[in-house]
Amino acid sequence: MAKSLRSKWKRKMRAEKRKKNAPKELERLKSILRTGADVVMEEVKEVATVLPAKEALEKQDDCKMDVDNKRNKKTLLDQHGQYPIWMNSRQRKKLKAQRLKGKKKSKLPKGLAW
């Protein structure tokens, strides 16, 4: 989609507004950190445990999520014969046709049984 003049103008004005307000915002953040840094940290410690970075990295382990249902990679069926919820009916029908095509065997031609 092409960029309209209006959207270009709005983007330009937002950038100028950010430039104008940046010093005020920086001062506001610095004042918050100067006055109440200890108070803020005390509130955070009450709510959650604060760990140093090294301990947090050591504590992190590579655990994988346990998945209860096992799916066949080729047919995408789970152990109960159900397709995934995101699959639409056309895809299900196509996979089912492929699966049944392999199962069919040629029948012996009917003839006179003597």
UniProtKB/Swiss-Prot annotation:
This is Protein LLP homolog. Its main location: nucleus. It comes from the Eukaryota. It is found in: Nucleus, Nucleolus; Chromosome. Residues 1-21, 91-108 have a biased composition (Basic residues). Keywords: Chromosome, Nucleus. GO terms for cellular component: chromosome; nucleolus. It comes from Gallus gallus. Regulates dendritic and spine growth and synaptic transmission. One of its GO terms (biological process) is dendrite extension. Belongs to the learning-associated protein family. The lineage of its organism: Eukaryota, Metazoa, Chordata, Craniata, Vertebrata. Transmembrane segments: none annotated.
